[in-house]
Amino acid sequence: MAKVNTYETLFILDSNHYARDPGGVAKQLEELIAENGGEVQVSRMWMEQKLAYPIDKHQKGTYYLIYFSMEGPNLTQLARAFALAEPVIRELTIKLDPRLVEPILANARGEHFTGPAGAEGSDDESTESTDEAVAETADA
């Protein structure tokens, strides 16, 4: 069994298509991930913006983010499915660093990531040493 990784995909979607049926477009993308063996962690619309240059005669695009987990070998098949999906103008998928998955997902959910236990003390120590360095510089 291959290792399960967490990925982030940023889509540029057809704004007209998304405006007509935002829930349907989101469901379609999430179903593509599920059909290819993935599990959606977080999905949300990011923004709508005029494109820097026309892409397939589209002047404006809706940026949509999806974070999901799946086995690596299935990614090629999923990329093909994304390319064939009607509302998708462009997409970019990246593999997330395992050390950053929790903070990124917490941020995407709108939550505050507190970090692993004991990490707070290290922040206090670094702040104190920074304060000491500033004080020493001011004295010089």
Curated annotation (Swiss-Prot):
GO terms for molecular function: small ribosomal subunit rRNA binding; structural constituent of ribosome. It comes from the Bacteria. GO terms for biological process: translation. SUPFAM superfamilies: Ribosomal protein S6. GO terms for cellular component: cytoplasm; ribonucleoprotein complex; ribosome. Residues 111-140 are annotated as: Disordered. Keywords: Ribonucleoprotein, Ribosomal protein, RNA-binding, rRNA-binding. The keyword Ribosomal protein applies. The keyword rRNA-binding applies. Coiled coil: none annotated. Residues 121-140 have a biased composition (Acidic residues). It holds the Pfam family Ribosomal_S6. InterPro entries: Ribosomal_bS6 (IPR000529), Ribosomal_bS6_sf (IPR035980), Ribosomal_S6_plastid/chlpt (IPR020814), Transl_elong_EF1B/ribsomal_bS6 (IPR014717). Belongs to the bacterial ribosomal protein bS6 family. Binds together with bS18 to 16S ribosomal RNA. NCBIfam families: S6. This is Small ribosomal subunit protein bS6.
